[in-house]
């Protein structure tokens, strides 16, 4: 029994050390650190919950990974495809906008107020590393990827996720704002407007 007790205690300590969750009102902040060999994976997630309308959640995700000191220095100082991809992809930033509806949605435009002239790309949501290197401001994915399903209506709630990948350059710009004001425009020309406190500074993301 003692061995089982101490085993469970160690598991609890491990989880507390690697998992941090902070919740206040309609906001959830979550940080997870995982280690695999010499690689450390770090995910920080900020979730803003909306009470009204079809837009239910705004989720901001910062993803990073750290190699061993020697491998890190090698990639930071070397040239070529892999070192360039390593530098371009660390850290990674993205917004996930989650909608509930009785149909599949597509979004043709995402506008950050104050940056209406931002350069927007529309690659597939799973961006290969070579496209990461060319990412200008942000990527909203292919708005017509599920076009053949747009006319269908379902007798249940469909969870739609719009993923917007942010470049490091654009992240530095929006981090300076006092408030995040974002307009999402669906393929049916319906607008979803967001106006919230800029959490990027508050949580040091």
Curated annotation (Swiss-Prot):
InterPro entries: BptA (IPR031471). Keywords: Cell outer membrane, Membrane, Plasmid, Signal, Virulence. The keyword Membrane applies. It is found in: Cell outer membrane. Residues 1-23 form the signal peptide. Pfam families: BPTA (PF17044). The keyword Lipid biosynthesis does not apply. One of its GO terms (cellular component) is cell outer membrane. Belongs to the BptA family. Virulence-associated protein essential for survival of the bacterium within the tick host and therefore within the natural life cycle of the Lyme disease spirochete. This is Protein BptA. The lineage of its organism: Bacteria, Pseudomonadati, Spirochaetota, Spirochaetia, Spirochaetales.
